[in-house]
Amino acid sequence: MIYNKQKKLRFLFYIFLSIISTLNWGSTAHRAMSEVASFYLTENANNKINEILDGETIVTVSTYADDIKSDSRYDKYYNWHFINMELDEDYEDTVPSEKGDLFIAINRCLDILESDSATDSERSFYLKLLIHFIGDLHQPMHIGRYEDRGGNRIYVKWFGRNSNLHRVWDSDMINGYNMSYTELAKNLPTPEKLEIEFERDDLIDWVNEVHSYT
């Protein structure tokens, strides 16, 4: 039934949101996030996800949205990874990019996954994107400031090496642990309580909260 499908997908969404705030956001973090989330999936939710992904796991697809960046056929999804706003702006006050942004992307993914008319290939593609974008949502530099392009124009030294603030958040910090994603997953603090229901209106609050950290 559609109701059950939506509930399972929203449950997965909330699990990711509950866990990702403990991580930084390179490929290792995306995989670790998905590994931990998989521990909390009910059997029915896991079966539904396996059906949509046709045997792939949420861990293996968690970097898919980054992996396809090098393929020009997917150029239109480039802007879906981030939102750039003025320092004192809330998302409601912005003029969304015609090319889309992270907020638009997550809602688009949910629309497809909840649609009766979506094909199997569409559901698979947009679930892969959603899994990744939930991770991007909680990386402050992915909801950053116009003037520094989400930290990409803030150049820093990281243990003597040239880097930028975005890269430090994305990968430098987590790579410093020298741990695999499975090791990270085992060492992450886990939420004491998970809420099953997710209201889509809450998404804009998450966007604004993350932006406040930039």
Tell what function each PLM region has.
Residues N24-F133, P140-T214:
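N-terminal, motif-rich segments that launch catalysis or mediate targeting to/interaction with membranes
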